[in-house]
């Protein structure tokens, strides 16, 4: 067994597959949370996902890999929304770290 396909060396999982799996994992880790997609056609650079949990929220910009390029305004909105609450770029290589940080933020 080689582990999840997106963790295999040399294989870059498509962003939409990683995002779909991530949404399921968020709902499992944070029971009762709402995970919804934000519309970058409305605000260019807005993060992909909004996570609502109890009285907290987080925004996650999903990338297929650590080296995937950032679109215009993404850095601005991730930083701005992180200052408001919690926002990060998330990709397979840092997923566990970001989800652990998110857990700490949601439980604080």
For the regions a language model picked out, list residue spans one by one.
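Catalytic phosphate/metal-binding cores of nucleic-acid and nucleotide-processing enzymes, i.e., regions
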Residues: 1-108
